[in-house]
Amino acid sequence: MNYEEEAHYLLDSNIVSEIIKPEPDFNVISKIAEHNSDCAICAPVWQEILYGLYRLSEGMNKKYLDKFINDDVHENFKIKNFTEKAAAIQADLRAKLEKTGAPTQKEDSMIAAIALANHMVLVTRNTKHFTAIQEVSELKIENWFGDSGRS
């Protein structure tokens, strides 16, 4: 990936996890291939991926996944950090959501804030996790699985 260019799509962990599966969803793989140079992940997603890896028992599968995650995922997708700008956006989102009574996971609001701070489209299968955030912000979401999203 050319790190001089800004990515347009921020991939959620469920999208990245799909790449790792032995039989990944065709639509997801096609979209990633089509937009590869326009895709990035963020630090909270990277943490979720590594956490999943570190929880695995030692063995061939863990060694394979470790190599794939560090050699392919890490090398192909720029990692967007949780910056001061994203922190301010997240604080605003959480305050707005609290006023509406809409619950949201702290990690989801961090991911959304990073997408908003970088003017990116969040790509996730879990669109329902971000519905309340969309209602109080200009967050754009795409579901590359093509289904209606999961809760």
Regions found by a protein language model. Give the residues of each.
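Short, hinge-like loop/turn segments at secondary-structure boundaries
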Residues: 56-60, 98, 139-143
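Active-site neighborhoods of divalent-metal-dependent phosphate/nucleic-acid chemistry enzymes
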Residues: 2-4, 51, 78-121, 125
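Alpha-helix capping/helix-boundary segments
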Residues: 15-16, 45, 86, 110-111, ...
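Acidic, PIN/NYN-like endoribonuclease modules and their adjacent C-terminal/linker elements
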Residues: 1-4, 8, 112, 116-151
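Nucleotide phosphate-binding site architecture
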Residues: 16-17, 47-50, 131, 142
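Short, well-structured N-terminal submotif of metal-dependent ribonuclease cores
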Residues: 1-42, 54-69, 150
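Residues that scaffold the ATP/ADP-binding catalytic core of kinase and kinase-like folds
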Residues: 18-19, 52, 90, 133
